[in-house]
Amino acid sequence: MSGNQTLDIKNKEFMLVGGLLIVVAGLMAFFPSLNDSDTSVDWISIPLVGFPIIVSAILLAFASQEKRARKEIIAAPIRLFTLCASLIPLAISTSLFFDWLILVDWDLSYNEYALQKKYIWIESIGASWHVGMDGLSFPMVWLTTFLVPVTIVMTWNEKNGATYFPLLLMMGGALIGVFVALDIFLFYVFWELTLIPMFFLILKWGGKDRRYAAQKFFIYTFCASVIMLLGLITLYFLQPEGNGAQYGTVTGRTFDMTVLFSNATAYNMGDNVFLGKDMQNILFAMLMLGFLVKLPAVPFHTWLPDAHVQAPTGGSMLLAGVMLKMGAYGMLRIPIAIFPDALVFYQDVIMAIGLISLVWGAVVCLGQTNLKRMVAYSSVSHMGVILLGIASMQPIGYAAALFMMFAHGIISPMLFAVCGAFKHHYHSMEIGDMRGMARWLSLIHISEPTRLGMI
């Protein structure tokens, strides 16, 4: 490819990104504000969660009916339609995010939810479609809606796009569902839903060892999710039967996080402990195990380097940018909020795991010759920093952990995008194969201050 052709492609990409920013800015004028007087509109269930998942499911069903030759023809319109569909959640979340920054002033309280909506789902067990956003979920929701269209643009020429791009969109919708769910049953449904598109992204568009990496990713995360599910079911059956009675549940129990948090706070007053100290410690350990594998933290991290090395660029961007944050988010949302006494009991253990992850990830990172594996191990180190902030049990530590989650969610996908560019140019991820970069990649040095944390 000649220099003029490369420059022409770059100009088209810059024009496309600039046009997207203009479209998003225009759409923001039509979407909600946190201080709107009309709260009857559900701005979360359909626009942020349901719309991406439904659209992606329709596109996947449509593409699966077409023959292979036909799929290459319909890939271009599906790619463009997927990009346009991803801009609507971005415009909505951007409008809400900036309002939240101004009005809430980074309030990280667990009981101040905006745009909260609740619908009875499975009345017999007390499960509901309950969604809302607070200071913990707002940054993660915006980060997800931002990264999905960016990932689509950065992998614009990916092969088999008729199914690839809808999977990215479905992944985004499932991730948003995790961050806005205020019902434990709903939370777990979206938690498991995120596994499906990522598994197929690695399996179908990955490298030569993609089957091994996809199976390892699925086995690790699914087994951890099963242990977490057992903990959630135990929590459901051990809670006082009057927990959900006032909400019309048949069993008298509930999956509602806000109710569980309120009751746990009330029980923990004085010498009382919600469910008892021993049971708190057991349930806390079961839930934390599931979240530590997803984070991931040492020694549960071995699935991550293989997944990143074999995953396509788009899969790595969403995996590093948002999917890893599900672990830290889940810790703060469920076990730490409901079982604070258990956090005190396990504080030293969690801090030790965080410190080991920080140091081990950094040391192993320095010895890697594969560029994507190097970035993957750096993510393990960064997740250790997040775990240390959580284990501090201080408001400033929680705020620092959330800031690190957000910052890593921006920087890490960009690093994997650069890795994808290197692979496209050198057809290799081995650092020893990358020579002669000074002439055509000199502008990358501009990014060094941000990578080193100097700005």
Protein language model regions, located:
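Cytoplasmic juxtamembrane interface segments
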Residues: 55-79, 198-215, 424-427
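Short phosphate-coordinating micro-motif centered on Lys-Gly-acidic
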Residues: 192
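Hydrophobic/aromatic positions within or immediately flanking transmembrane alpha-helices
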Residues: 79-82, 141, 165-168, 188-189, ...
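Transmembrane helix-loop-helix hairpins at membrane boundaries of multipass inner-membrane proteins
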Residues: 1-50, 54-154, 162-166, 246-254, ...
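Hydrophobic "anchor" residues on beta-strands that sit immediately upstream
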Residues: 130, 179, 188
